[in-house]
Regions:
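Conserved phosphate-donor/acceptor-positioning beta-strand/loop module used by diverse small-molecule
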Residues: 126-149, 154-164
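Extreme N-terminal, non-catalytic leader segments
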Residues: 1-27
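Small-molecule kinase domains that catalyze NTP-dependent phosphoryl transfer to phosphate-bearing small molecules
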Residues: 153-198
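ATP-dependent small-molecule kinase phosphotransfer cores
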Residues: 59, 64-112
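Pre-Walker A (Motif I) flank of P-loop NTPase domains
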Residues: 25-30, 111
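Short, amphipathic alpha-helical "lid/cap" segments that border enzyme active or binding sites
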Residues: 101, 197-205
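Glycine-rich phosphate-binding P-loop
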Residues: 30-47
């Protein structure tokens, strides 16, 4: 972990204000962090459809490439990961992270939306009118989804699951200085193995609906 990254992260967003209902003029943004294979992408899509707002996941790769001047392949290879346990930043990965942070801040400033991954909850930490969600599931359910829905071979699924989660965890630690799955950094954490994706999305929608009524 590079301590300088935490200082930079703290300077990205607005002043600390964890009140969800404050800042009424701001767009409402939902960030979804997720364990690999938990269905966070699909749940985010369903939620965005239910809310009638834009959904951002892989689209952020294109937008980050445009912001940074790097190719989309370079962005895809260097986002949400770090090269081992580095004490110092990889210049390309840092350029990608900074460009992606600017993209996320710009999106959050102009439209209500659902954003999946990319440390959006940390980039928007303290910003009013954000709901930060973490989606997880038991390993058996995640492996089943990875194999049946993502088309990953059985003998590769477990290793891919562990590697992807570890990459996300190390990326979060390196750039935010925080534990990726720590409940302190989320308003809502949901076990997707306990319900269908549609039910999980509806549960998040219900929370947002209650907040809007306050």
């Amino acid at each position: 972990f590079n301590p300088e990254n935490r200082r930079r992260m703290q300077g990205l967003g607005e002043k600390e204000d964890t009140t969800l209902s404050s800042g009424k003029s701001l767009p409402f943004v939902v960030t979804i962090s997720r364990e690999y294979g938990s269905g966070g992408h699909h749940i985010g899509e369903l939620l965005a459809q239910r809310l009638g707002v834009k959904f951002y996941d892989r689209e952020l790769i294109t937008l980050t490439a445009q912001q940074s001047g790097l190719g989309e392949c370079t962005v895809q290879e260097n986002e949400q990961t770090v090269n081992g346990r580095l004490l110092y930043d990889d210049p390309v990965q840092t350029a990608v992270f900074r460009a992606q942070s600017r993209v996320i801040l710009d999106i959050a400033g102009r439209e209500s939306c659902v954003i999946v991954g990319r440390l959006a909850n940390f980039i928007l930490k303290g910003r009013p009118r954000c709901l930060h969600v973490f989606v997880y599931a038991d390993e058996a359910a995640r492996l089943k989804r990875i194999i049946s829905e993502y088309g990953i071979e059985n003998n590769r699924a477990e290793a891919l699951l562990k590697r992807t989660d570890q990459e996300r965890r190390e990326h979060c630690l390196h750039y935010a200085g925080c534990d990726w799955g720590d409940r302190y950094y989320y308003h809502l954490m949901l076990d997707s193995s306990m319900a269908t994706d549609e039910q999980v999305a509806e549960a998040i929608y219900s929370v947002i609906h209650c907040l809007a009524a306050e």
